[in-house]
From Swiss-Prot:
Listed name of the protein: Cytochrome c oxidase subunit 1
Provenance organism: Leishmania tarentolae
Pfam families: COX1
Function description: Component of the cytochrome c oxidase, the last enzyme in the mitochondrial electron transport chain which drives oxidative phosphorylation. The respiratory chain contains 3 multisubunit complexes succinate dehydrogenase (complex II, CII), ubiquinol-cytochrome c oxidoreductase (cytochrome b-c1 complex, complex III, CIII) and cytochrome c oxidase (complex IV, CIV), that cooperate to transfer electrons derived from NADH and succinate to molecular oxygen, creating an electrochemical gradient over the inner membrane that drives transmembrane transport and the ATP synthase.
Transmembrane spans: 18-38, 42-62, 66-86, 100-120, 148-168, 186-206, 222-242, 246-266, 269-289, 306-326, 340-360, 379-399, 402-422, 460-480, 484-504, 520-540
Entry keyword annotation includes 4Fe-4S: no
Positions bound to Mg(2+): 370-371
Length: 549
């Protein structure tokens, strides 16, 4: 208990970064479980595993989106890796406001708890992660779950703002005089630009959510048409934050990938200044294209042309980054490690998401594909595969700085292959389904879409087996650590017996051996049961398809 209090109340940037990482990975696992239930429901026609409870299906979608965006991807990059490594890379002993750093972590933890509490309160919150009125108004969702979730958005937003203020104060107030801005690494530049974006956009979202709370609890009519309000106002407010949120998530990943390319290539990324300017241009343009999410609300032609054109224009600085990474790979004598495979997979996945985004920037195509699974496949390739694969890349790259273990190239290649195959099995068919107008946010569909929905479930279960493989991999590491520990204790006990004529160390070794061996056996039994569960799901689904079709 003392150790737990010492860790949680620490003001060290490294300890706070590790706490962010642990809680964010836990929240990501919770969000993944929600998505697994969504895919299991969509693998059947009609009454699936949720027994026709469409409200609970919408609650799962809402919780999955909010947790993955606000409680996993944002904190794991800005709170975890940025908190841990930015002071080290910039040569600072700590963040400029250590207690503010600790306060932001606790607010993040409270916000995550409020999101989970909103999932468990009454009938839940089934309004979608975009929180659109009028569905979120008191007439349609009267439970306290909506208030819990909007309070969670406030807490998570304040946590991110405090973290960003702390980062900006650290970079500008603690900078040494002989350090120029161009001497910073690309990861520091990416964190700086992301912090500025957060400070600009998050207060706008907080204001919009506060107006919803006023409509629900204080009888105002900011979004109520009957009282003179405007429904489209909240869409403008939300997407003014929502689209820069994509770059808030991706820019730290861009900086992380650039830093890893520099490390494995033993030289700077090609055209470092162009990489910095491209990130700045992406951030600036990203704040002026929010309405390309709203082409179907009845805009005039000029507004559609402007937002569509600027959306295409964002592809130019993005292409600069992609081509610079590829050029750095081709013209650098780098050693082939598992990090190289991860970076290549990130570039490939992000390229698919960027190309499908160019399709959606066209106004006519976007109107046809709006609210279909094409959009779901696009933003999952950008966020779920681009950002998460980038996080995996940075996490494994920096793992040697946290744990004294060595990862084998063969096992990492298996890990990358499984992740690549499972992710593409899950998300790539969504584009084809979207072309055939497969609707999102609806748990039932015609029988003609059954094959591809079940095929995507196999990709989801392959990712589940990947998580179990990671658990088994760490159990293998622990097993070898146990073996080395027991061998050393056994040698020490023999030394004590021959020189001091006592069997006490041998009894201690035997006791530790039995206790830890029991723990190892229980761990592996649990893993075997999990693998059997995954196999049972595969067998049950295949049997159902065989008799149904």
């Amino acid at each position: 208990m003392f150790w737990l209090c010492l860790v949680c109340l620490s003001v060290s940037h490294k300890m706070i970064g590790l706490c962010y990482l642990l809680v964010a990975i836990l929240s990501g696992f919770v969000g993944y479980v929600y998505s697994l239930f969504i895919r299991l429901e969509l693998s059947l026609i009609g009454c699936g595993i949720l027994f026709g409870d469409y409200q609970f299906y919408n609650v799962l979608i809402t919780s999955h989106g909010l947790i993955m965006v606000f409680a996993f991807i944002m904190p794991v990059m800005m709170g975890g890796l940025v908190n841990y490594f930015i002071p080290v890379m910039a040569g600072f002993p700590d963040m400029v406001f250590p207690r503010l750093n600790n306060m932001s972590f606790w607010m993040y933890l409270a916000g995550f708890g409020c999101v989970v509490n909103g999932f468990l309160t009454e009938e839940g919150m089934g309004v979608g992660w975009t929180l659109y009125p009028t569905l979120i108004c008191i007439d349609f969702h009267s439970s306290l779950a909506c208030d819990f979730v909007m309070f969670a958005v406030h807490l998570l937003g304040i946590s991110s703002i405090l973290n960003s203020i702390n980062l900006l104060g650290t970079l500008f107030c603690c900078r040494r005089k002989f350090f120029s801005f161009l001497s910073w690494s690309l990861f520091i530049w990416a964190a700086l630009i992301t912090a500025i974006l957060l400070i600009i956009t998050l207060p706008v979202l907080a204001g919009g959510v506060t107006l919803i709370l006023c409509d629900r609890n204080f009888n105002t009519s900011f979004y109520d048409v009957v009282g003179g309000g405007d429904l489209i106002l909240f869409q403008h407010i939300f997407w003014f934050f929502g689209h820069p949120e994509v770059y808030i998530i991706l820019l730290p990943v861009f900086g992380l990938i650039s830093t890893i390319v520099e490390v494995i290539g033993f030289r700077c990324v090609f055209s470092t200044v162009a990489m910095i300017y491209s990130m700045i241009l992406i951030a600036i343009l990203g704040m002026f294209v929010w309405a390309h999410h709203m082409f179907v609300v009845g805009m005039d032609v000029d507004s559609r042309a402007y937002f569509g054109g600027v959306s295409i224009l964002i592809g130019l600085p993005t292409c600069v980054k992609l081509f610079n990474w590829i050029y750095s790979f081709l013209y650098t004598d780098m050693i082939i490690t598992f990090e190289v495979y991860f970076v290549i997979m990130f570039i490939f996945m992000f390229l698919i998401g960027a190309v499908t985004g160019l399709f959606l920037s066209n106004v006519g195509i976007d109107i046809m594909l709006h609210d279909t699974y094409f959009v779901v496949g696009h933003f999952h390739y950008v966020l779920s595969l681009g950002a998460v694969v980038g996080f995996f890349t940075g996490f494994i790259h920096f793992l040697a700085k946290w744990l004294p273990i060595e990862l084998y190239l063969f096992w990492m290649f298996y890990f990358i292959s499984t992740l690549f195959i499972g992710s593409n099995m899950l998300f790539f068919p969504m584009h084809s389904l979207g072309m055939y107008a497969f609707p999102r946010r609806i748990s039932d569909y015609p029988v003609s879409f059954l094959f591809w929905s079940s095929f995507m479930l196999y990709g989801m279960l392959l990712l589940a087996s990947l998580i179990l493989f990671l658990c088994a991999l760490f159990c293998v590491f622990l097993f070898w650590d146990y073996c080395l520990f027991f061998v050393s204790l056994f040698v020490f006990s023999l030394y004590c017996f021959f020189y001091f004529s006592t069997w006490l160390p041998c009894v201690m070794v035997l006791y530790l051996l039995l206790v830890d061996f029991a723990h190892i056996v229980l761990d592996y039994l649990f893993l075997i049961l999990c693998f059997c569960f995954v196999f049972f799901i595969f067998f049950w689904q295949s049997l159902f398809l065989f008799f149904y079709i």
